[in-house]
Amino acid sequence: ALDHFYEDGKTFEEVYDHIVSYVLDQCRSQDVVYVVPGSPVVAENTVTMLVERGQAAGVAVTVLPGMSFLEVLYTRLHLDPVNGVLILDSSDVASLPVDTTVPVVITQVYDKRVASDVKLSLMDLYGDEYEALLVHHISLPDEIVRPVKLYELDRIDTIDHLTSLVLPEP
């Protein structure tokens, strides 16, 4: 497990850089299997970085498919992405346009500071009382899917890196 990189890193960029460097270093002396939860191409920056830096270093990287949390979320909430769903990382909510005419999934609402930033950006578009869905640990035994008003978002104690917010279609 590479959890210690997350505990020691100051930013996600730093954490990802250290993980990729470590994995590529291990590849010099042995075959390595690097496994991520869910799909390796959904919200997994380290995989993209491994492919790019692996190619540059002459290391063969094979990426195999896996099911992401999004497939579970679509099923639980009866969302058909073919009809339109906007998926944003929490760090992009303030800087990217949000289409309020389709359901919006905001991933990686990983702490109260991020939740507060997301809340403030969304309240400008939807209003304080808008009811979103908090999706926490989906498909795990302690899964929570519950309504939450936007103004309450940063008051929730169960927020971590496996927390998302869904803004249903208006």
Residue ranges and their predicted role:
Residues 34-107:
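Class I SAM-dependent methyltransferase SAM-binding "motif I" and its flanking Rossmann-like core
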Residues 2-10, 69, 93-94, 113, ...:
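A short acidic, often aromatic-flanked loop/helix-cap motif at beta-alpha or helix-coil junctions
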Residues 28-32, 98-170:
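A contiguous loop/helix-start segment that scaffolds small-molecule binding in enzyme catalytic cores
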Residues 22-25, 49, 72, 76, ...:
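Alpha-helical scaffold segments in soluble metabolic enzymes
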